[in-house]
Amino acid sequence: MREIVLTQTGQCGNQIGAKFWEVISDEHAIDSAGTYHGDSHLQLERINVHHHEASGGRYVPRAVLVDLEPGTMDSVHSGPFGQVFRPDNFISGQCGAGNNWAKGRYTEGAELTESVMDVVRKEAESCDCLQGFQLTHSLGGGTGSGMGTLLISKIREEYPDRIINTFSILPSPKVSDTVVEPYNATLSVHQLIENADETFCIDNEALYDICSRTLKLPTPTYGDLNHLVSATMSGVTTCLRFPGQLNADLRKLAVNMVPFPRLHFFMPGFAPLTSRGSQQYRALTVAELTQQMFDAKNMMAACDPRHGCYLTVAAIFRGRMPMREVDEQMFNIQDKNSSYFADWFPDNVKTAVCDIPPRGLKMSATFIGNNAAIQELFTCVSEQFTAMFRRKAFLHWYTGEGMDEMEFTEAESNMNDLVSEYQQYQDATAEEEEDEEYAEEEVA
């Protein structure tokens, strides 16, 4: 089977991870003790993608939980699904990274890395046919960003031919927790460009907007935000876990979504958006799903897809629906909005359909777009980075842990290169449109 090992790093990564395991366990009818209580053979058929069977018929998540301070671990442990995880797979330090990328990467985090890699190896060895690794982390803090990227490079060294897929929570301009976020994020993106295969860029600002605008929640909590992220995460792996008419897996996604190796930063979306614990009253049609899915308000990254063009798109539908209708709708969207799709990739939309919908919905769709507008996120971080770095503000916290200023300069220029690469393909599409219009005028 095609197993996936999930590594959750830092406070943010662990909270998202814990929520994700709740969602997955619910879909496969596994209770908080790891026991199966379902009535469908489909739930058990491929349960070993995310779980392995322990003694006594208990199903244990293939999860590695890492943090440099014990607080989050304790709350996951005492949370609703805390007893499901293997106790050996909780690895925590004592002193925390203090929002410092250098601590997570070079000092505190580096000391823990070997014991984390031992657990990762153990999990990988218990797989029949390991598909790849998923990592949840935030880029604004110290552990998720510094130690998270360190683990990615270690995993890449040991498993060079396996897919590494990250769910990275980027700092957003309006919702800021820490002053040094731009430093941590830039240093992390520098690593992700080189070592990850697929990065799903999610940011809190977009999630807050979805909660207040679409779900009409007066005071959204992190629990509500994590609910949205976990819905997307579950959608991405759904084809591996349940049978479907058109399957996708992490590798197929990468092959269809990444036109050039560095451009692997995706904006995810989900439709229909529902708040925690609510039921949907009306079944959506495939047309409405497709419409919602491409709507800028449904994107989980705070950048407007209409400002860029889609290089590639993947759409994963869930629920019973006629394939023909799905194909028609996807064609219509591309046909009506052809200016938003790069026309030098002929068929740049990958579709997958899985028959089993998520709990409480008749059908749903997960959207993954590789859009040049994602550069807005990086540009915003880059501007803040430059403003601080020009004055060398807060730099002593990093150099004190053994970092060199040169690393900052390298990371900055690598991220700026990424922005200009996206811009270049954006411009290529715009130029082609102008040429076509010019040619039409000449003919006329």
Curated annotation (Swiss-Prot):
Under SMART domains, the record lists:
Tubulin, Tubulin_C
Residues of the region (Disordered) are 421-444
Q: Which Gene3D superfamilies match?
A: Helix hairpin bin, Tubulin/FtsZ, C-terminal domain, Tubulin/FtsZ, GTPase domain
Q: Is Cell membrane a UniProt keyword of this protein?
A: no
Q: Where is this motif: MREI motif?
A: 1-4
Q: What is this protein called?
A: Tubulin beta 8B
Q: Which residues bind Mg(2+)?
A: 69
Q: Name one GO cellular component term.
A: microtubule cytoskeleton
- Alphabetically, which GO biological process terms does the record hold? microtubule cytoskeleton organization; mitotic cell cycle
Query: What free text does the record give on domains?
Result: The MREI motif is common among all beta-tubulin isoforms and may be critical for tubulin autoregulation.
What SUPFAM superfamilies has UniProt attached to this entry? Tubulin C-terminal domain-like, Tubulin nucleotide-binding domain-like
Q: How is it modified after translation?
A: Some glutamate residues at the C-terminus are polyglutamylated, resulting in polyglutamate chains on the gamma-carboxyl group. Polyglutamylation plays a key role in microtubule severing by spastin (SPAST). SPAST preferentially recognizes and acts on microtubules decorated with short polyglutamate tails: severing activity by SPAST increases as the number of glutamates per tubulin rises from one to eight, but decreases beyond this glutamylation threshold. Glutamylation is also involved in cilia motility. Some glutamate residues at the C-terminus are monoglycylated but not polyglycylated due to the absence of functional TTLL10 in human. Monoglycylation is mainly limited to tubulin incorporated into cilia and flagella axonemes, which is required for their stability and maintenance. Flagella glycylation controls sperm motility. Both polyglutamylation and monoglycylation can coexist on the same protein on adjacent residues, and lowering glycylation levels increases polyglutamylation, and reciprocally.
Q: What does this protein do?
A: Tubulin is the major constituent of microtubules, a cylinder consisting of laterally associated linear protofilaments composed of alpha- and beta-tubulin heterodimers. Microtubules grow by the addition of GTP-tubulin dimers to the microtubule end, where a stabilizing cap forms. Below the cap, tubulin dimers are in GDP-bound state, owing to GTPase activity of alpha-tubulin.
Phosphoserine carried by residues: 172
The answer to keyword GTP-binding applying to this record is yes
Q: What is said about its interaction partners and assembly?
A: Dimer of alpha and beta chains. A typical microtubule is a hollow water-filled tube with an outer diameter of 25 nm and an inner diameter of 15 nM. Alpha-beta heterodimers associate head-to-tail to form protofilaments running lengthwise along the microtubule wall with the beta-tubulin subunit facing the microtubule plus end conferring a structural polarity. Microtubules usually have 13 protofilaments but different protofilament numbers can be found in some organisms and specialized cells.
Q: Which GO terms describe its molecular function?
A: GTP binding; GTPase activity; metal ion binding; structural constituent of cytoskeleton
